[in-house]
Amino acid sequence: MAVPKRKKSKAKTAMRRAQWKLKMPGLSICPECGQPKAPHRVCSNCGYYKNKEVIEVV
């Protein structure tokens, strides 16, 4: 099996791990109520999706 010849420094390890960052979720604006919502999903504020009421929100 392959074995590393030298120990990886803390700096090299940190530089490699710097690419592991998370991406922010994309948000779109609901055309009915103007609140931010996840794209391709029902608005949790008003219950509309593609200009139709899908769920009733109290």
Curated annotation (Swiss-Prot):
Entries under Pfam families matching the protein: Ribosomal_L32p (PF01783)
Claim: Zinc is one of the keywords in the record: no
GO molecular function per UniProt: structural constituent of ribosome
Domain of life: Bacteria
InterPro entries recorded: Ribosomal_bL32, Ribosomal_bL32_bact, Ribosomal_zn-bd
Keyword Ribonucleoprotein part of the UniProt annotation: yes
UniProt-listed PANTHER family: 50S RIBOSOMAL PROTEIN L32, LARGE RIBOSOMAL SUBUNIT PROTEIN BL32
Family: Belongs to the bacterial ribosomal protein bL32 family.
Identification of the protein by name: Large ribosomal subunit protein bL32
Organism: Sulfurihydrogenibium sp. (strain YO3AOP1)
Species lineage: Bacteria, Pseudomonadati, Aquificota, Aquificia, Aquificales
